[in-house]
Structure formats: structure tokens, C-alpha cells
Design a protein with these regions (language model features):
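Acidic, surface-exposed loops and disordered segments
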Residues: 1-179
Length: 179
């Protein structure tokens, strides 16, 4: 998992290559009902990041934060962003990919995870770092579901998962040995 990114857009050609490769991921009943939403530009990602933290701060300030998984984190995330720019959800990633599946799909939960697994393998093979972002997933699912249409995800689809990605700002010289 990469949690430190260069502030640099992934080239459109490489991004399209990754998305095209992941499109070959199998789906239950070969339905291919996935909807893939990509934030492919740093400026768009910055706008999303700002909007999410602003809304989280409003919910915390007004006492309207829903009771959900990671509620304590979400109560403080907007305040920490406002106070010093701490980006606990997005990790300053320049991009994200969010996958949803048709609510009536045979494998509504599994298909997006398989898609993102393909995306991750191809991305890492091409030098792009990724992070399975549970915090963004929980935030969109439990706290800010009204953001889903902004991301192009209609009511006919169920949020599957989110992945951050971009060029890593840290180089790891060697990996941990495995048995």
C-alpha cells in the first residue's frame, strides 16, 4: 500500500491502459454491470477532497454525524484538515477510482473487488502506487452517500469500493522476504 504520492497526474495514456486492462476482469454471470468512476486530475481530486472535509466538518459541528463505523475518525477528520491540512482519508493521492455494481447484479459485492484487484496489479506493474481506501468507502457509503451522484454513481448501483493511486513519492529499495 502506498500512502505517499508525488503531486503529479498519471499520464492519460497510462491511465487508459490500466482501465482497459481492468475492464477484462470477470464478473458474476459475465454481466459486466460495473460502473467505474475515476478522478483523473489533481485539480478535480483537490476539489473532491475539499468538499468531503468541508461536509465532514459541518456534520461534526452541527451534531449531525451519523452513527457509523469509524465515526470517531470522521468526527475529527474535517477539523484536522481545516486546522493543518491533515489528509487522513485521501493521503494526498492525486487520483482515485471508485467502482460500483448494479444493485441487481449476481455478485454485487464481489465484482468491484475483482475489478480493483486487476487494476491494482496492472498499476503496480507500471510503477503506479495504490491504496485500498476503506476510509473513503465508509465515508461515501455511511456518511456522505449524497456524494455518489457527484461521482457519477446512480441510484441503480451499489458502491463497491474505492482505491487511491498515483506515482509513489517513496522508493522502497527491497521488499520483505517471504517464506
Amino acid at each position: 500500500s502506498v500512502r505517499h504520492y508525488k503531486r503529479e497526474n498519471v499520464s492519460p495514456g497510462l491511465l487508459q491502459e490500466l482501465l482497459d486492462s481492468a475492464a477484462y476482469a470477470p464478473t458474476g454471470s459475465n454481466a459486466q454491470n460495473l460502473l467505474v468512476s475515476v478522478v483523473d486530475d489533481i485539480a478535480a481530486m483537490d476539489a473532491l477532497r475539499e468538499a468531503v472535509y468541508l461536509r465532514l466538518d459541518e456534520l461534526a459541528e452541527t451534531g449531525a454525524m451519523p452513527d457509523c463505523q469509524r465515526r470517531a475518525f470522521f468526527l475529527s477528520a474535517g477539523k484536522l484538515w481545516k486546522a493543518g491540512g491533515w489528509d487522513g482519508i485521501f493521503r494526498s493521492a492525486p487520483h482515485c477510482v471508485i467502482v460500483a455494481n448494479a444493485k441487481n447484479a449476481t455478485c454485487v459485492e464481489q465484482d468491484p473487488l475483482i475489478y480493483l484487484s486487476y487494476f491494482e496489479l496492472m498499476a503496480q506493474a507500471r510503477g503506479i502506487g495504490t491504496l485500498w481506501c476503506g476510509l473513503l468507502y465508509w465515508c461515501l457509503r455511511d456518511v456522505l452517500p449524497d456524494f455518489l451522484p457527484r461521482l457519477g454513481i446512480p441510484d441503480t448501483h451499489q458502491l463497491g469500493y474505492a482505491m487511491l493511486f498515483g506515482y509513489p513519492s517513496i522508493n522502497y529499495r527491497r521488499t520483505v522476504e517471504t517464506r
